[in-house]
């Protein structure tokens, strides 16, 4: 209005308003986070929220080595107290504290998840902003075990389009997890998280009187690998052929190694496979185990029984 008075409205050209319209939808990153929430809640987990400020004593509670990178935490200049004096470098303490609170209140079969940031300094003292990384943290005790947690992780990976088979490296080296029940989650050659049973000593420190299980997934890596593109194929007019196969092998051979062989040998005919039994007992030689799979093959052109049996 002031410009019209100064310049005279007759000297101002008539134009149409311009602007950019955007589609009202979630960003790709938020879509991946939404899938994480949906999968966790579908599997019976409730969302929790914990503080980003913690005590440096947390690192001792988690039995971290003195030179562990997670001890390199950012100090708060004006903390409310020692309990909130550093920015967290792992979301695990908040999850274990929440599980302990529920256990002490006699809540049974607790399943919790959290989507929250951790803060990893590039150098100390700070010379630039830290690396903020979102972690998808799952924790539970009561009904369920290591394989229940593994199933949740696999379901999440499938829903965000990670179609390659993830593997589990048992040499995770996490002091806060049970030495024989932990694994790094590896996808496409990258470690994208870890999971396992909480170390009994750590569970005792936090006051959790049952076996507890956790999984921590690095969301930036998952977002980079995820895709929501889907391809569909018609239904094969030839019936699928299923075979049950049982194999005796040394205990040192991992199930993931067996499944890698199945995928490589199955070729184009392989539709699905499922582990349905692992047996160790008197009928099996010491140091060996029996592993049984159900394997389904299908073809869109032809499929003969001897072709299925050949591999």
For the regions a language model picked out, list residue spans one by one.
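Extended, well-folded interaction surfaces typified by the phenylalanyl-tRNA synthetase beta subunit core
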Residues: 1-3, 7-108, 296-298, 304, ...
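General structural feature for long, well-ordered alpha-helical segments within catalytic domains
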Residues: 32-36, 91, 95, 111, ...
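Generic hydrophobic alpha-helical scaffold/packing signal
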Residues: 37, 77, 96, 100, ...
């Amino acid at each position: 209005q002031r410009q019209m008075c100064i310049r005279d409205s007759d000297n101002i050209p008539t134009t149409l308003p311009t602007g950019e319209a955007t589609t009202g939808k979630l960003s790709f990153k938020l879509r991946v986070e939404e899938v994480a929430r949906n999968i966790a809640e579908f599997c019976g987990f409730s969302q929790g929220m914990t503080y980003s400020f913690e005590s440096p004593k947390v690192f001792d509670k988690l039995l971290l080595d003195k030179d562990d990178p997670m001890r390199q935490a950012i100090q708060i200049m004006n903390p409310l107290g020692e309990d909130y004096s550093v920015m967290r470098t792992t979301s695990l303490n908040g999850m274990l504290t929440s599980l302990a609170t529920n256990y002490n209140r006699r809540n049974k079969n607790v399943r919790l998840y959290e989507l929250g940031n951790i803060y990893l300094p590039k150098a100390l003292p700070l010379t630039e902003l830290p690396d903020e990384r979102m972690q998808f943290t799952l924790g539970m005790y009561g009904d369920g075990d290591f394989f229940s947690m593994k199933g949740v992780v696999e379901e999440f990976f499938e829903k965000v389009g990670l179609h390659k088979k993830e593997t589990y490296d048992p040499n995770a080296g996490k002091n806060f997890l049970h030495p024989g029940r932990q694994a790094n989650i590896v996808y496409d050659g990258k470690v994208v998280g870890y999971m396992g049973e909480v170390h009994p000593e750590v569970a005792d420190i936090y006051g959790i009187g049952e076996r507890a299980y956790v999984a921590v997934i690095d969301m930036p890596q998952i977002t980079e690998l995820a895709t929501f593109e889907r391809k569909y194929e018609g239904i094969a007019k030839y019936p699928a052929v299923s075979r049950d196969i049982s194999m005796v092998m040394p205990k040192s051979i991992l199930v993931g190694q067996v499944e890698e062989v199945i995928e490589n040998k199955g070729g184009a005919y392989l539709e699905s496979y499922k582990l349905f039994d692992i047996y160790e007992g008197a009928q099996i030689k010491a140091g060996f185990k029996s592993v049984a799979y159900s394997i389904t093959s299908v073809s869109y052109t032809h499929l003969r029984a001897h072709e299925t049996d050949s591999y």
